[in-house]
Amino acid sequence: MSVPSAIATPIAVAATPRASRARGGVVQGRISKSGNPLRVAPRANRRPVASPMAARAVATGPDGYSVDGMGCAELDEQLWEHEGHLKYRWEKFQERKAAIADAEGSLAEFAKGYTKFGFNKTASGEIVFREWAPAACRAALIGDFNGWNPDATHLEKDEYGVWSVTLPAGAIEHGSRVKIRMKKGDGGWVDRVPAWIKMSYSEPGVMGANYDGIYWDPPEHERYARKNPRPQKPPASRIYEAHVGMSGLEAKVNSYREFADDILPRIKDLGYNTVQLMAVMEHAYYGSFGYHVTSPFAVSSRCGNPEDLKYLVDAAHGMGIRVLLDVIHSHVSCNVEDGIAGFDFGQPTQDSYFGEGEAGYHWLWDSRLYNYENWEVQRYLLSNLRYWVDEYGFDGFRFDGITSMLYNHHGLQMEFSGDYNQYFGFDTNVPAVNYLMMANDMLHESYPGIEVIAEDVSGMPTLCRPVREGGIGFDARLAMAIPDIWVRLLQASREGNLRDEDWSMHDIVATLCNRRYTEKCIGYSESHDQSIVGSKTNAFWLMDAEMYEGMSTFEEASPVVDRGMALHKMLRLITMAIGGEGYLNFMGNEFGHPEWVDFPREGNQWSHDHCRRRWDLADTEYLRYYELNNFDRAMMNLDKRYEFLAHEHQWVSTACDERKLIIAERGPLIFVFNFHPTNTYEDLEIGVGMPGKYRITLDTDAWDFGGKGRVIHDAEHFTNPGGPESWVGPYEQEPRPCGMKVLSPARSAQVYFKVPEVEDPMKAAAAAAGVSEFREIRVSNAGADGAHSFDRAAAPTPPPAPAGGRPRGSFYDPDNVDPDFAPRGGMNSSQFRAAPVPPIAPSNYAAPQRREIVDDSNIDPDFRPRAPANFGASSGGSPPPPPPASNVVSPVRRKKVVDPDNIDPDFR
């Protein structure tokens, strides 16, 4: 979640020193009184803020670290008002880091505790077990290996409260059960799962069965060996949030290997470059979504064993996909019989993993909270991070719920207004902040390409500034206010309290762009939080029960489905366009998954029916879920092609409440959003930052995505000097350098790219061959990667072709040409400069055309072609003339079988 700051936001729209209010712990932004945007100067032209406080010199040491922790104040003058607090937390961070280096060698070595604690083997094969339990009076290792005899394997305690024992090689069999038995100060004995255990297990199907630790030491031939290198860190992360257990189509718990084999290819096909895995750390209660962790070092045994998880991560790397772990260091399950919570005997804080009183308990989550100031707890948590990276190959982390860590009040019953006094004072949990600084410092120093993301609802300043500047060190934060505004708008519309005509473009832009300069955000329109039972996904808010009855393309969409399809695409696209420097989606939401997530529980008779993903809906071509899935693929590959998420040029030029228009520039792209339910704008003049020629590269209204096909995709739009003169929106501080005219249909969005102004080798070759007229033929690769990346071809001057352009709203493949095709007449507005379509010359093809064999025995008698309702009516144009008879879609659908061995080399 992000909060306003006094400095310019990355996107050039309203940024204010304060937010107006907070709803449910989430800051709601407002716009400055002037309504004018704050713009970001080019990096080379930036100057210090004109303030005596902001102009203070920031000193750095020879190691590049800030001398006093005030480097983060260089870009935020409000931080100087809290200089004392920031210097204090920096001093404490440096003190502990120096003490660790003195005692352990370095922070990185300190974080290798998993090689010393728990079960480890010496070079000679002996088994060494160590456990930190200073409150225990006596301890013994028990398990299958010694018949659970508490007198067989006693542990010895050192001066630091560490118990240990060394066993002969082979004394414990791989896969056998183990526990530690400890005597408490009151004389009682307890059996506990070792805190550093690598795997734990509970008998499936047995109600109330407790977990046992599992000694995991497979023989060499059973160990998984990595085959693929880590993918490089992408310019911007397109994150697919996934839960392995509920990722299958069948009503069961899916496995790590099934996810790797069946789901990862889907993620790759959609164009995501990162997968964020939930519920990997062992948790006793499946319905907790993985957030009530019992054993932080153990993999969730429901989905497989450690070698299976290594297979998954390596398979992702082989596909070029990075893997983030949803790590939970903000709290831990209270289940004393199942995990680390059992090591609390009521001892003093200095001898415990957990704090005392309110410092050690989160009443809303019913969870224990770590004692972040304790030396051994810091070792435990830092080593936990390094273990997942070193042992399994994870590429980063998403830190869950760190608001609970940042403040002594844990964010409970708090409304964060953006006032800096809420962030820097006695409410701040400085030891927890220092732990997060050490975690990020260790991770980024040890693994330069790692990515660490924070989930924080408070908007803590400096959260995503480097540790060397005095920041907390995260790479990005989740923009948690964005899904809230969509839920608020969609719920109000569904309940009849807000018309679409009354949506505020001003509020939408303010929320999506409300983030602190230089602190990156991951934008998302919805996540697992909106998918869980009791909440609703955007698709469910939009279409409700009609998602079950009105999604067949054999029938005309109802008004509810038509609206839902259009807005589902628009909400996701605008979130990605201006909502952050990265993007996240929860699995299934990309195609509007119609069912909520309800884990097996007593209330649903322990059913898995709603704890799975209906991939079959996205794969069925005659369902509208298939079209939404296609759009998500195209949206991901839009960034893959243009890298606009990582681009520094970000500018929202227009947010017009009267016309319901939002226009933004991001990198080389122009985004035009028309949220009006009925008004289509022809010859709409929009401001553009760079002069030149533009074309559409993505259209929510395209036929391929379940749209109405109201826009001609191959039209060329040329800019004119001077900004738009027809009107200036309330967000436009001044007209843009130039303008161009576009068609903006109701409830749709189009993305334009600037055609590079370089000498075209294809045109040069055509001119050399005596071709007087040149036309680009766009070969859509949408079926392969969804990005609409195009090859190009030139043709000699053809004989006169029928008037008009190619069909609007469709991308087609010139390798599959109907020689009898005559294009329909289209809307020829003055802004469209399209040459007639020439026939394709055979010399333009790299491969010969294949003949198509039609199987007349495979006919769908119920197939009826769809036709756009009231084509052209919304834009004021007349309906196009009917196409020639040879162009009319057959009233039956035939299966086309391509014979690759049947090639016609003379095809024309």
Residue ranges and their predicted role:
Residues 263, 308, 312, 377-388, ...:
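Alpha-helical packing segments of well-folded alpha/beta enzyme cores
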Residues 50, 54-240, 256-271, 560-585, ...:
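Carbohydrate-interacting/catalytic domains
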Residues 200, 221-239, 243-428:
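Substrate-binding/active-site clefts of carbohydrate-active enzymes
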